[in-house]
Amino acid sequence: MKCQLLFVATVCLASVWALPVPDEEVAIQPDSGAKAELLTKTVLPTAVEPAPLKPEAEKPAETKTIEAKAAVPEQPDVNANPSPSTPAAEPAKEINSVELKSSAPDVETAPAIPEKKTLPEEAKPAQENAPVEAEKKQEKTARTEAEPTVEAQPQATKAIEQAPEAPAANAEVQKQVVDEVKPQEPKIDAKSAEEPAIPAVVAAEKETPVPEQPARQERINEIEQKDAKKDAAVAEEPAKAAEATPTAAPEAATKSDSNIQVIAPEKKSIESSPAAAAASPAAQAAQAKSGEAPKPVDQQKSTETVAESAPVLKTNAPLAPAGATKVTEAVKEQEKEQPAADTAAKALPEQKKTEETAAPAGAPEPTAAVAPAAVPEAKKIDEAPAAETVVKGEEAIAKPIAQSPSAEPKKSSEEKSDKSESKVDESSESKESEESSESKEN
């Protein structure tokens, strides 16, 4: 066994050493015609001789049969590939077995022939495509180099265009902040009423009066509605008291006098009759006789609140010039007081008639004598202070009008103080109205 293995090894080594070294550029062909065609296509100008046949003749028969079997399947590969060596393939079929044996090593290298023939054909389109691709790449690079510059310019322009957009967004945010701060304005005014006015704040209010108009107009309307409701309630109260007097006792008549005389100064009617305007002294005299002491305090409070009602509407000052707003405020107050005064003037004669009818109806003689005695006294007292009360009412209304030109620089501080006073006055008026209604019900 060892001998056989050594023999086979030596045969293999001899066959390997006998094989020619295949060149990458030249393929050896069995025919001379094929050699001539190859020479025209190869780079080498010299003809290539076939490999020597001596070592192959010395080979044993086993290697020859193996090589012959290997050559048979490889021949169709040579014929299958189209090449100018196809006419040489026909004489190759007539070659003897010895030539096949001798060309066996050449046939092993035969697959390199079509590769060599196709390589230049493939290289040509590759070479043609290479410059085209190079041109395309150059164009792309040129475009990419040009495009960044073109893109950089719009970016620069965009950056320049976006710069003015930032203030617009800030303006919108400022508008939202102003809208959010509007409901907090009364709180700020109430707190700063105690502090001295800052001219910068006044200038800011003068510059931007438009967005503040709706809120302040609503507040003014609310105040006016409250005043109208109070006037209507005051006008209805004497009528109710007049209806209650016919069935009441003479003592009730004196109470109705006191009620009428407490209510009349709250209206402070300028155009009403002197008896209606000067009811407060008669009320004090009647209350002194009847012993009703706590009502003059309410009366004083009511007169003070009515006198202070004129500057309540000074919250309109930022909406227009100072003098015009204050004059219009006085006119509005007069217009409001006129219907209230008319209703009071109508109610007072009716109450006097009811009192006159109630006094002689079923009252005892002493009380009946007291009531007529009180009437002439009230008339005497009314004639003297009637003009004084009317003049006082006119002066109270004329004071804010006279102060309007001189009070312009002090507008902001006065407005803030007036707002706080108006709030306090409204609270005191509401408390007084509740107390008066409770006392009348009792």
Swiss-Prot record:
Keyword annotations from UniProtKB, A to Z: Developmental protein, Phosphoprotein
Chain intervals with Low complexity compositional bias: 159-172, 241-255, 272-288, 357-376
Example of a GO biological process term: gliogenesis
Tissue-wise expression: Expressed in the embryonic CNS, in sets of cells that are segmentally reiterated along the periphery of the nervous system.
Annotated region (Disordered), positions in chain: 47-442
List of residues that carry Phosphoserine: S430, S433, S436, S437
Compositional bias (Basic and acidic residues): 55-67, 114-125, 133-146, 177-194, 204-240, 329-339, 408-442
Role noted for this protein: May play an important role during development.
Official protein name in the record: Protein bangles and beads
